[in-house]
Amino acid sequence: MLINCHTQYSLKYGILSLEEVFIKVKESGHDIFAVTDINNTSACMYALKEASNYGLQAAVGVDFRNGIRQQYVCVARSCAGLKEINDHLSFHLINSLPFNSKAPSFENVFVVYPFGSHPPLSELKDYEYIGLKPNQIKSLYRSRFHSLEAKLVILQTASFRNKKDHNAHRLLRAIDSNSLLSQHPVNQQAMISDLYLSVDEIKKLFEDIPKSIQNTTKLLERSLFNLDFETNKNKNPYTNSISTDLELLKAKSLEGLTYRYGKTKPKKVMERLHKELNMIEQLEFGSYFLINWDMVQYARQRGFYYVGRGSGANSLVAYLLRITDVDPVELDLYFERFINPYRSSPPDFDIDFSWTDRNEITQYLFNTYGLNKTALVGTYITFKHKSIFRELGKVFGLPSSDIKRFQNDPEAALFDDYGKHIINYAGYIAGFPSHLSVHASGILISQKSITNYTSTFMPPKGFPTTQFNMHVAEDVGLHKFDVLSQRGLGKIKDSISIIQLNQGKKVDVHNTSLIKKDLKVKDLLKSGKTIGCFYIESPAMRMLLTKLQADDYPRLVAASSIIRPGVSKSGMMQEYILRHQNKKRRIAAKKELPELYELMEDTYGVMVYQEDVIKVAHYFGGLTLAEADKLRRG
């Protein structure tokens, strides 16, 4: 009978995590309850997905408030109702509008107005109710509403388990208003009676109004629905159908063959292309490739520079679509590391753009795929050690010198009366979400409206952003496109403009075959003169290039891999360098383990790359490439 449960996503108000809510609700004897956070739907998806694991059934909705003042509580009756709530909340958050005291017309939503702050009875619709708190029962008897039991439900706001929860809430409210705890108005805080009451306690309190118990139970039972968490919710298809997606993907891949390989069509390349297209068709990932292709095609039309990186470099199709500039056939990169039958979610393309161009790329995606179906991925900034000490110190009125001292030496706080409170509650609220922000690069492009799954808000970045993070998005079936920013790309663009201005030469930085053959480039690499080159300009990297005399692409790739912590700490980096510099050591290694050496001849039999794990598991363990990748992922 709890239709107004708050979690930590009632920002700077709620105290319990959703897991703690599940546990407390179950302990209190409830089977059904509703998660209705204040102006936030972040917990809704997880509540729908995980409640059954605790033996519970969860309804979801929103507690609509202007500041602390509750206007009404909405509970979704279906997926369509959740979308209505998300649309309503998003509109007000994006436009920074207060909520009216009267809810808009809904078709699939229950609305509960707090007793005493509701529209005239004659205006209440069949899905609208009046919510009564235990401390309002006496007021009911003195009003004309006593005869209208059909419209009464129990509105026991559930925010706390105990007094310590309430104290933490008071601190959060003071932090939110940037005021001293001693001066924070009581009317800007929740009541200490906003507890998770047990079923028996609620029945006892409302025993003289049995109809309200029946109405509340019925409302919750009629608000139960299932959401599909299994299928991919990304835009799919890209065209009108999956089959035409594949036809377009094949056509664009064949066009790319000429750009990448000239008039020749190497047999090995064609076999690899056929294999990849079959796997993409099988997993219905054609739309994912085509959206990335559309993005980089627009970038080229606008003269923007970009780099596709990550495991996407293992895909020949990505190379042919010019999403990446790495030839996976030349480097013997396995497509299975990027896509395989054991991976149901779309893979990640990490695409870097210049910081000057990224916003236009983002705007292009919103314009092309629709404002209602596109959103930036949200993320939560949480309370961490230093921020907690700072904020709690401020609400207790401590001078900044004391706050800094406690931040640097928490034990010193134990000898101060206020410091003890800070230590006590710092651990209590550590990890609580503080406020919503924007993921560094993620963009969601959905087949249906984003508000089927989440509300959105408008950060300073200027694009609608989801109220849930990437992990919840993935649980729902929404997988992000990564549009990143890399300042070095802007410098490359500027450099090429200067070259064209001074020398009249037009340089194609995506034509990597020419760069690989350039003798001056080779000399710069092996002499470690790589200042200004992304990733290979650090002192350690330049020293390594000099040691290896790396003057070709395979050596450069190896150098950029062995310097990573995992390889370098395991001793494989040192062994690779020794074998590279010492022919006798290479010969000895080949004699000792000829099969392993032959398998990884480019790295002298030393496991350097992620692909090497796949190779060894495949050739020595008898696993398929897809199974070997699953082993690699752990």
Locate predicted features.
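Helix-rich "cap/lid" substructures immediately adjacent to catalytic or cofactor-binding pockets
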Residues: 266-307
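Active-site flanking loop/helix segments enriched in acidic
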Residues: 263-264, 276-284, 595-601, 632
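Asp/Glu-centered strand-loop micro-motifs enriched in Gly/Pro and often flanked by an aromatic residue
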Residues: 8-12, 27, 263, 279-287
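Extreme N-terminal starter segment of soluble prokaryotic enzymes
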Residues: 1-2
